[in-house]
């Protein structure tokens, strides 16, 4: 009985203490409302004692009869003593930052001396996250030169459309381009009195030549496939005299991993179809159709210190050809060694090549070629380069290489003689060039230097010196012994951009045929006329305003005693052009 009373008293005492402790916690919660602690307990986390209990059926309350329960919070304002001491220094002045937006389009136009004109428009618009479409248009013109008997103005027009599609696996770039180059055969001999030549009637001569090129390209590139690239392009060329030429080229690249190496295959197909209205001497139509199949087979190793490629090139010639054989084999070796302790690497390249020539290719190099050519492929049995190159972290790169090549049928631009029975055609006035093929050996040096100061400031210069030696012709016509190309880009104060490029062409020999008044001498050996070296220089200065407008100034000049790439075709000198550029967005 006594034990029962003791247990009852202990139970009542524990119950009393628990009750007062609960009241004390509630008071503490009301007094300290600013500090709340929330404990998140995962739902339906049974303990061992609840596992075997019978769960009661859930009861859904009647929302029509039960009143909504509203939660009210009582906010108690508590005075706070601030300990913040303000800084006595003067406040910083906010400076407005210049906005640098990227635009997808721009339009430029300019005008300068010698009747210069320039119109330039370009736009690249994103259709969606994978596709982009672009358009580019440019037109430039130059007026007549002084003291020229025949017209000498020229202009250039180009319009192209581009479509780009890219994903994580591949990239497709397709383009459609039309460009037209309008020139004149005005390069008459300057040491003749043309008024005393009866067969020369300038009032009846039309020196015009229009070279029109229509080009379609489609380039496919895969990132994670054995087929790396597929390229297709076709070119249709039509000139002022209704001569036509069609080029088709298809090539691909396949790379197969084999152990620690790669097996690389590059099949290629080239096709040339040329139709000339009239030949130079016989005045009869001249046509040529040639196809070339090519397969490059090589093994590639890309190592940490040593990279090498070795294999073979196979060519098979089809169609109209005067070559001795239709099948050609050439070795191909590329080797590069870079030690781990140095940034200097040594490289060796040795291979051969076989190329189809075309009126399209020649006219882009020399627009004053005769509008009828004898086309032959160029056979290069071997060519090699041996040298060193270096790349520093500071942005400096350079290379030095010794070069040698032998060509069995190298194309040379040789000046044609004056034709007495010229039919008032300007290209018969000793103003045009034919293409002759000769064996040519070239031995020399190549150097290159590139300095990248940062993203917008860089300077590069490349030099090539060779000693061309021909075998059948008395000189390697119009091949300079030294060529120097340089380019520089600089930005100042984030507003001023300077672009400069130039080219130095050394001395070279040109064929010179004396003019005979009453007889044709097609087979007479020409004299050698040495052309002086000259330097072509072009510079563009652009000032970008805070708005979308920019002002630019262009300067072009030639330096030398006889500043012309081709004999008696004096280039324009001291050209100035001032223009505006406006950037904007095109949104669909």
Predicted segments — roles?
Residues 6, 21-97:
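N-terminal periplasmic/intermembrane-space "pro-region" immediately following the signal or transit peptide
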Residues 87-89, 98-147, 151-157:
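Outer-membrane beta-barrel translocator/receptor signature
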Residues 95-102, 127-130, 166-172, 222-230, ...:
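Short loop/turn motifs that connect adjacent beta-strands in outer-membrane beta-barrel proteins
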Residues 102, 107-110, 305-588:
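Exposed, low-structure sequence patches enriched in small/polar residues
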Residues 121, 159-161, 216-220, 250-254, ...:
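Membrane-embedded beta-strands of outer-membrane beta-barrel proteins
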Residues 125-147, 264-268, 272, 287-319, ...:
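Surface-exposed extracellular loop regions of Gram-negative outer-membrane beta-barrel proteins
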Residues 142-154, 158, 173-231, 235-247:
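Flexible loop and strand-edge segments within Gram-negative outer membrane beta-barrel domains
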Residues 201-219, 233-304:
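Outer-membrane beta-barrel transmembrane domain signature of Gram-negative proteins
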